[in-house]
């Protein structure tokens, strides 16, 4: 299945789970914010109802992954390649000032296009070579500039995510990205904008009905 969240104004967030095969919404909940406190009891209630996924593709929000691991310890968490690529390239900026940053950005630009085990192995090999060449350089970079901090931050991001990047290559039913659910949220928000001014209670009712009726046509 696929997990994603989207905010509505400042007073609420929609948490959503989608079936990766038929792209229908499995369950959703409107909460104050995307957090362990709100997600954990929701996940537990779904588990009690019989939901036990083998794989969950997620955007990488740490508090949500912690809740998922506690509720479904057997589930593999596939990191969304698009989110990883976008986040890393945003931190590296369009024109990195260091050679290490430029090479890492070039490597990251290939991530979401990996379709085969061979391409995966090439990516991992190239990243291992990059780490070997630049790890000490990054370790001793002055941490007085945001750009230097963000270069190290990107390296840590990839290091932490790497074990969970490529489950989709072993099982074609596992999505590599959360794009399908993000597309659902985009359509929801586009429709919602035609109903601006709803109270929070009516907004939740609107979202509930939208998810219900959209499931009839997806």
List PLM regions with ranges.
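Conserved phosphate-handling catalytic cores of large alpha/beta enzymes
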Residues: 94-96, 103
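RNase H-like nuclease fold core
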Residues: 1-62, 66-74, 180
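A short hydrophobic/aromatic micro-motif that marks alpha-helical segments and, especially, helix-coil
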Residues: 19, 34, 98, 195-197
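Acidic/histidine-rich catalytic cores and adjacent linkers
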Residues: 54, 58-65, 72, 102-218
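Short helix/loop capping segments that flank catalytic or ligand/cofactor-binding pockets
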Residues: 11, 26, 66, 90, ...
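Inter-helix linker motif
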Residues: 72-94
């Amino acid at each position: 299945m696929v997990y994603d969240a989207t905010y509505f104004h400042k007073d609420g967030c929609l948490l959503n789970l989608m079936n990766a095969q038929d792209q229908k919404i499995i369950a959703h909940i409107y909460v104050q914010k995307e957090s362990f406190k709100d997600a954990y009891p929701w996940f537990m209630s779904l588990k009690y109802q019989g939901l036990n996924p083998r794989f969950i593709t997620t955007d990488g929000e740490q508090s949500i992954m912690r809740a998922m691991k506690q509720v479904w310890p057997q589930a593999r968490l596939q990191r969304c390649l698009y989110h990883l690529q976008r986040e890393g390239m945003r931190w590296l900026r369009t024109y990195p000032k260091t050679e290490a940053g430029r090479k890492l950005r070039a490597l990251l630009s290939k991530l979401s296009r990996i379709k085969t085990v061979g391409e995966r192995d090439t990516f991992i090999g190239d990243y291992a070579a990059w780490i070997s060449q630049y790890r000490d350089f990054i370790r001793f970079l002055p941490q007085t500039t945001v750009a230097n901090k963000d270069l190290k931050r990107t390296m840590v991001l990839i290091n932490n995510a790497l074990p969970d990047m490529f489950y989709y290559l072993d099982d074609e039913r596992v999505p590599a990205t959360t794009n399908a659910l993000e597309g659902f949220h985009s359509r929801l928000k586009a429709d919602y904008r035609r109903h601006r001014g709803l109270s929070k209670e009516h907004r939740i009712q609107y979202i509930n009905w939208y998810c219900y009726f959209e499931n009839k046509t997806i």
